[in-house]
Amino acid sequence: MRKHFIYTLWGIFATFVVSAMLAFFAIWNGWIGYMPDIEDLQNPISRFATQVYSADGKVLGTWNLNKENRIVIPYKKMSPYLIKALVATEDARFYEHSGIDYRALGRAIIKRGILGQTNAGGGSTITQQLAKQLYSEKAGSTLERLLQKPIEWVIAIRLERYYTKQEIIALYLNYFDFLHNAVGIKTAANTYFNKEPKDLTLCEAATLIGLCKNPSLFNPVRYPDRARDRRNVVLSQMVKAGYLSRGEYSRYAAEPLTLNFHRTDHKDGTATYLREYLRHYMMAKRPERGNYPSWNYAQFVTDSILWNTDPLYGWCNKNFKKDGSPYNVYSDGLKVFTTIDSRMQRYAEEAVYQHVARYLQPIFNKETSRKPSSPYSDKLTPKQIKVILNRSITQSERYQTMKAAGYSEQEIHDAFRKKIDMTVFTYHGDVDTLMSPLDSIRYYKTFLRSGFMSMDPKTGAVKAYVGGLDYSHFMYDIVSLGRRQVGSTIKPFLYSLAMENGFSPCDLAPNRQHTYMVAGRPWTPRNANHSRYGQMVTLKWGLQQSNTWISAYLMSKLNPQQFVQILRDFGINSPDIHASMSLCLGPCEVSVSEMVSAYTAFANHGIRTAPMFVSRIEDNEGNTIATFQPRMNEVIGAENAMKMLTMLMGVVDGGTAGRLRYRYNLEGQIGAKTGTTNNNSDGWFIGFTPQLVSGCWVGGEERDIHFDTMSMGQGATMALPIWAIFMKKVYADPSLGISPTVKFDLPDGYDPCHKPVSEQDDFEQVDGIDEVFE
């Protein structure tokens, strides 16, 4: 009987062993549950953020979506404290086992499974935890979790075969979700401590490793005391593992929990506006006519041209991975190398802040504070202002959300007038306040806006890009997406057409007011000053002084349709450009990027260079999968380009941009043009040297928000100083290799007229000019 009982036990044991072996064999081969294949094991982290780099190797930021904000780093870039804390806390015999710690597993089965000691600790190794994170779905029940365990054991053994211990630790820390969109140790170190992982202190490393047990429970932002206690548990485990002495533990455990918390998202980093513009640009889909409303046909045409001519536009949907799927900037871990220079980007952002925030904005606030219509012009009636504000309400995200939720118009408008807690932008940092959504709309309209871009005229490489004040609060990108009336900055293109049609800079024109018949109606352009009125003046003088009468005279001698065509050749694709006499005064709306690119032709022998934002793209393994080259087209002949260059240099040396010399003391050869529009609504300045073409626009969110006086509202006051401040910073940095001693490629003694020009024609200082379109 006893012998039979023993045989029975052995039979049961043998059956269990054989069944277990068969089960593990089936799991190993993927017959039971999911078993990753070799390719999957070789690249277990397949979804992580795309990194955007500057031309000088700095990380500008990342593109991510939800839990894909992950930047993978190698083991050698992690603090030794991280490694020791992780091993001591999660798997003390990590370096001794091959994926499964049988001693810890047996202890866990006896204490937790048999004796019911829930606080006895688990038996999972770091490798098993990694297998769970990578391949196990969240279990819906205890039974399902028990079934997942043996699958994770097998995966852990396979991971140990493919990877070294260091690589397993790197995988674990790169994959773990540390909360607050901090996925992976690099993002976590930056989010919680504003540091690189290799620079973490012992206490900081222990705090992050403490999250590995239960991130929500030991969240240091929400539960600092609990997180500190957990950190000290990690430190005590390091003592047990021999990584710390008792004395060191006592000293570190007494330290307070100190965070430098900053949630990381796509709005952070440098060159934010450019990164967001590129993200949408690269992810664009092939334009389909049915996706555009009838009134936006021009945009469909523009996008179609971009799709066919610019390799970067829609790049993700034009290029495909090995599996045939399109690239995704949110999850494919690409490296996008932009042409931005991080130093020049910083100088540009500083220049915009220095002039707009510290100089213009206080003056504008003082001027508008006296108006009941603030920030709008006092020419508007209360009824007109109400219409504008109501339009802003209906365009807001809050309105759209409430409308979709079924609220009535009255309920929505009542909600917009009710004060609530909110955080608003100031130049001194975000401020918590009590304000109604309607008041916040009006508040944000008080801020002057600005856009700035700088590029290399030879290669098209965009070196600096400032799309606005602060992307978190002002997401509209003025440089590429915004279009504003260009005023006098359009005149060099008119003069270029004149040169192409045989005119010379020294040809004479009557400087007087004249009425032209346009489509049977009289048109009489006005000029802001009457200097040399009634005299015959050279075209060069007319451009230097931004004289409206000379521009109108030229327009009367040229074909307006040809003018439209040459604007297109210069890369200006604004849909509201129409052939008319008044087009010579710049009433059309154009983006900063288009204007800056157009002016490259004057510094580049008549060859216009398109902006190039990206030089190359790498995949997540470091392979170059795309490179980009300059895109150029000749718009005017080289001889005429030299004529235009000498005239635009005259704008600086004796015209409306003269303050670059006498106020900002900028040296070297510079060509430029100022621009101001009706009622001082838009201030423009485009300037160029042999090495850089840069342009900026300053104005209100809407045209009725502007300075009252021309002295403050002209382009020479609003926009020119940004260019000047930027260039002074650039010239002061020898590492950039940009110098005022570099000269334009002009023949020695070049004379565009082949005849002497009077000194009066060359030098007559004018600070700025008003542009009128009537």
What positions do the PLM features span?
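Active-site SXXK
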Residues: 85-87, 238, 348, 459-460, ...
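Peptidoglycan glycan-strand catalytic modules in the bacterial/periplasmic cell-wall system
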Residues: 46-49, 53-307, 313-316, 322-325, ...
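A penicillin-recognizing enzyme superfamily signal
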Residues: 338, 342-358, 391-456, 461, ...
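N-terminal type II signal-anchor transmembrane helix
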Residues: 1-53, 93, 113, 359
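Short, well-structured active-site flanking segments
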Residues: 95-105, 183-186, 245-250, 499-519, ...
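Active-site-adjacent helix/loop patches that line small-molecule binding or acyl-intermediate pockets
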Residues: 125-126, 134-136, 141, 145, ...
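Non-catalytic structural connector segments
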Residues: 245-339, 343-407
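Short, glycine/proline-biased beta-turn/loop segments that scaffold the active-site neighborhood
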Residues: 256, 481-536, 610-624
